[in-house]
Amino acid sequence: IDMQDTNKYKVYKAITAVGKWLLFAIVSFLILFPVLWIFVSSITPPGELFKMPIDYIPDHPTLESYKFLIENVGLLEKIGNTVLIVGVTIVVSTVICAMAAYGFSRFRTKGISIAFAFIIATMLIPEVVTARPLYDFMRAVGLYDTYPGLIILYISAVIPFTVLILKNFASEIPISLEEAATIDGANFVQRLFKVVLPLMKPAIATVCIINFITCLNNFFTPLYYSNNIQVLSVAIVQLPLRDNMYGVPWDLVSAMGWIILLPIIIFVAVFEKQIMDGIMAGGVKA
């Protein structure tokens, strides 16, 4: 009987392992196939895109789509705009939110708790709800279609999540470390910059990475609040048609989509551990 039970357990374990790997393979295929197909479409000549039967590997791969984007769509300018706006957003939002997170984690009064709750609650408000009032406000104060205006909107979009993660992480830092620094003669600023912030580096790195991805994927803000300042996320809907070509230029759409996806894929692949560790550490305590 013991031998039979052992054999049954081995069979069950083998079936479970096969099932897990099969499920993993199916999910991976469903996720990766569209990404790979975008890349294949981007290097496929327009005349071969809709050829039947479908060629999953193009007969005549070409980089003409990327060349066309660089020469005719101002791709380098869009990349520059994206780097400027996203870079300033990450730096400014991280500094502001790190200061705010420290205050929320250390000064526990009713008013501060209410302010924190209001900030987090804004994560639940859809962008379309505030679109028209913000649009009118941006035009009234002269910030519509300007770099400062877009940067302010980008910063406001990432503040709630950043404050939440950093505040929860800061709450886990023992106050005794600051008390020891105070005994050694450190003032408030020294405690903040020499004790607390260095310990928050994992969480700060995490929110910087996630905010980079969030800003890079932000489609609504640059589309609605800007006309002349173009970034990568909206470039895909502003692609011109080639000469004597009607309909959607799918090869250009695929090339632009791949250009947008590539830095995100690289960032997630390189910083996967930091992202997960930071989120887990920042989500321990609300």
Model regions: which residues?
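Short, Lys/Arg-enriched N-terminal segments with co-localized hydrophobic residues
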Residues: 1-2
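A structural signal for multi-pass alpha-helical bundles of membrane permease subunits
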Residues: 8-12, 16-286
